[in-house]
């Protein structure tokens, strides 16, 4: 396939606490440089984590942005070819150059429902850290899927199939959703629903992790809450929207158990 999912980014109100969460629960490791960039004092990045395949950026949330999932990204065999395909078949797509000094830079585009996507050339000179290397590592706990909401899932699925050459996994598609894959990771397109404000919203919805043992993860989450309460997962079943939110995330066809990270990002766990 031409495209591989290699990147996901979160706006965080506490990068250090969230990094501890992902390191402790999922065994993710830093694979880009940590610390403030000397050449750019405004760059407060603490480095990016990885599961060996996909990098996770925890970016300090600036004014005007909401905490939570912000964008994801593809590494491409031929950036020029994909760019021309987008311009020809989806001429209304917004393009802009990726920010200087970030680890996964190239172009920023939007899909038909407004989801922000970074696209970068494999082996490109602007890739840094683990993104610049072909080899990664295998680990039992890793990012399994990224979920997007759309009013018309079939049309959005067509976009990802046509532009990025993802293929449908029919056995994992269901309940109005469509599951696509790059051969390793999954992109799940869920239908919008009218039973809550959140389920009506198009765009990034949640992420999913594959784990080897759900009960072991639950115990580790309990221990994390005792040892580092600031890095503990957020409760889903709280407030007047809690039950609706729990029911919504539980309805994901790829998940078995749902949690939320310290910033409230919803995470589906599956074995």
List the predicted regions and their residue ranges.
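Vicinal oxygen chelate
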Residues: 4-13, 47-48, 61-139, 171, 179, 222-271, ...
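Core segments of cupin and vicinal oxygen chelate
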Residues: 1-55, 100, 105-108, 147-188
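Short, charged/polar, Gly/Pro-enriched secondary-structure boundary elements
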Residues: 53-57, 66, 114-117, 184-188, ...
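Structured core of small recognition/catalytic domains
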Residues: 154-233, 237, 242, 247-249, ...
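N-terminal beta-strand motif that seeds the catalytic metal site of vicinal oxygen chelate
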Residues: 1-19, 69-72, 122-157, 174, ...
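Short beta-strand/turn micro-motifs at beta-sheet edges
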Residues: 59-61, 130-135, 193-197
């Amino acid at each position: 396939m031409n495209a591989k999912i290699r990147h996901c980014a979160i706006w965080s109100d506490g990068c250090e606490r969230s990094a501890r969460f992902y390191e402790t629960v999922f065994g993710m490791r830093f694979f880009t440089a940590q610390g403030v960039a000397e050449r750019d004092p405004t760059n407060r990045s603490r480095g990016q984590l990885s599961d060996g395949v996909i990098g996770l950026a925890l970016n300090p949330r600036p004014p005007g942005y909401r905490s939570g999932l912000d964008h994801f990204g593809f590494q491409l065999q031929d950036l020029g070819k994909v760019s021309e395909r987008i311009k020809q078949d989806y001429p209304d797509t917004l393009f802009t150059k990726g920010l200087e000094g970030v680890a996964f830079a190239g172009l920023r585009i939007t899909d038909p429902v407004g989801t922000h996507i970074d696209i970068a050339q494999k082996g490109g000179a602007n890739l840094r850290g683990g993104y610049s290397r072909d080899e990664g590592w295998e680990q039992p706990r890793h990012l399994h899927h990224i979920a997007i909401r759309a009013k018309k899932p079939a049309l959005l699925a067509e976009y990802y199939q046509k532009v990025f050459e993802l293929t449908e996994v029919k056995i994992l598609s269901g309940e109005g959703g469509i599951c696509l894959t790059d051969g390793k990771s999954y992109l799940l397109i869920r239908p919008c629903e009218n039973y809550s404000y959140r389920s009506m919203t198009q765009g990034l919805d949640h992420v999913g992790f594959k784990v080897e043992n759900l009960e072991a993860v639950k115990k580790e989450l309990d221990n994390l809450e005792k040892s580092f309460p600031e890095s503990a997962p957020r409760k889903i079943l709280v407030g007047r929207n809690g039950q609706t939110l729990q029911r919504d995330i539980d309805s994901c066809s790829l998940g078995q158990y749902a949690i939320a990270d310290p910033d409230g990002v919803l995470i589906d766990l599956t074995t």
